[in-house]
Design a protein with these regions (language model features):
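Short acidic, low-complexity intrinsically disordered linear motifs used
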Residues: 1-13
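Charged, amphipathic alpha-helical linkers/stalks
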Residues: 12-34, 42, 51
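Conformational-control "hinges and anchors"
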Residues: 18, 25, 32, 57, ...
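Amphipathic, membrane-inserting segments
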Residues: 33-69, 74-77, 81, 85, ...
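Membrane-proximal, non-transmembrane alpha-helical segments
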Residues: 97, 101-107
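Membrane-penetrating hydrophobic segments
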Residues: 105-131, 142, 146-162
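Short hydrophobic alpha-helical membrane-entry/anchor segments
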Residues: 133-150, 168-184
Length: 199
């Protein structure tokens, strides 16, 4: 049951505010291609997604939804850049992705929870290698999973940021593992939806 933001746990409320802002910046980036129809379609989709997120009360579900949407926008944008996705198709894919999120919510939420927990173990134990880790994570996230070498470069950069044997290393590796799985799961769902969405 959702009793509005007021009766919510403070942590969840704060998270919703933070995540809500990210959707606002998504509009700036993903709905400003200059293609009026596509931008309008994306603005609508992003507003819909944000409204959906604002109705959630479980923090891991919120994280899962945010990660899912963020990855959806990136993939749609990539499709648009490569002339594979137009406004109409983007709207359809976005709507179908929301259905797919509901259907796969259990798995996606579990992955988000595991990732968060693993990172908090890792995060408490280290701060020193943060720069290398940030660079490594960026590469690991956007290195195409097909491009294993780039993924490995990302992971090695991350590893060089701390001693792998330490608690933080194990936590972060686990976090990256779940992060990879999350990214992969989102990608598989997107690929499936895109395939079944003809305009």
């Amino acid at each position: 049951m959702h009793h509005g933001i007021k009766g919510m746990r403070w942590g969840v409320k704060r998270m919703l505010q933070k995540m809500g802002k990210r959707y606002d910046s998504d509009v700036k980036w993903h709905a400003s291609t200059g293609d009026k129809k596509y931008d309008k379609a994306m603005s609508k989709s992003i507003a819909k997604d944000k409204a959906q997120l604002m109705g959630m009360t479980n923090k891991y579900e919120i994280k899962a939804k945010r990660s899912f949407d963020s990855s959806k926008y990136d993939r749609l944008r990539y499709g648009w850049d490569n002339n594979k996705v137009n406004a109409k198709r983007a709207s359809k894919i976005s709507d179908k992705m929301n259905k797919a999120f509901e259907e796969n919510k259990g798995t996606l939420t579990k992955l988000a929870a595991n990732k968060s927990r693993a990172y908090s173990v890792g995060g408490k134990a280290f701060l020193a290698g943060a720069g290398a880790i940030a660079a490594g994570m960026a590469i690991a996230k956007f290195g195409n999973p097909k491009n294993q070498r780039l993924m490995n470069v990302g992971k090695n950069l991350v590893l060089s940021g701390f001693t792998a044997a330490s608690l933080s290393g194990i936590g972060l590796l686990a976090g990256m593992h779940y992060g990879d799985k999350q990214f992969e799961t989102e990608g598989n769902i997107y690929a499936r939806v895109k395939k079944s969405t003809r305009v």
